[in-house]
Amino acid sequence: MPTTTSLTTTYAGELAGEIVAKALLSNVSAGYVTMKPNVPYKSVVRKIDDTVTFAAGTCDFTPTGTITLTERILTLEEFQVQRQICKKDFFIDWTTADVMSGRVNTQIQDAIIGRLVGGIAAANETIMWSGVNATVGQYDGFETLIKAGGSGAVSAGSGALTSGNIIATIWDVINTAPAAVKGAAEKPALYMGQAAWEAYMQAQIADGNGWYLTGGPEVNRRFVGMYEIYVCPGMTANNIIFSQPSNLMLGTWQENQMNEVFILDMQNLDGSQNVRYGARFYLGAQIAVAEDITYWGA
């Protein structure tokens, strides 16, 4: 059955380049976690913790200290996006010049694929945080993995985040975290959604930090000068995660079909005026050492 097509004449124009897709969230969170770009469906991911201790100098080799290898299985899920649209409906509204020939020219193909890829990125921005594997079209996101029973991650509490409590709540999360994590060479970061970040800025402005009112995109996103604040549009409201980026792993399978999208004019195949387009790809998430992760949220 063809996908239902919604056309908006507000975006009409003679050139395919004037086709305007809806504004989509960028998958900005992918830049704040550890990417595993070529996971062949299932892979053992490891994190090494090396506790170094000094010993008195001797002529012998005597191993000291503790090396801890933590293993978890990162399993990818296969996903697909498939769409079909009638060229007649599409061209009538946007490209009069191509109606007569029925062509799907390069500009139109770029517009279709651009929207498809943007849609995949937008959907994954949310799924990578709150996705649930039992739900069709999703995999377990970081929030789901962290809050799962027996995960080992440490809860600092839950409740609504407002400009009146956001700073105190962040301190609660940080103070709950293990000292070894806060003092590690790889500093943990604070992950929060857009609403929490806006509450944080409001709190700073109320405290007299006017830079948060006028600083724009360049405003400082670091808490007390030590911990980066990563604003992740896909995170659910009233959640904060305090973790090292290496503890949050997002896997894909780029050498297989990840980022491979297609557009297919069906006219020469079945005589129809349909255009099919879509993508097939693999995604999955996993956490490494859950005990090193502190979070706020139910």
Residue ranges and their predicted role:
Residues 78, 187, 274:
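Extracellular structured ligand-interaction cores
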Residues 2-52, 140-165, 201-298:
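Sequence/fold signature of self-assembling virion shell proteins
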Residues 171-207:
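Ordered core of a single globular domain
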Residues 81-85, 92, 192, 231, ...:
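Hydrophobic side chains in beta-strands
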Residues 8, 86-93, 191-196, 243-245, ...:
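Helix N-cap / beta->alpha transition motif
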Residues 95-96, 128-133, 184-193, 213-217:
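Short coil/turn segments at secondary-structure boundaries
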Residues 54-111:
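Long, hydrophobic/aromatic-enriched structural stretches that serve as scaffold segments
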Residues 94-176, 295-298:
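Alpha-helical scaffold segments that mediate packing/assembly in large oligomeric complexes
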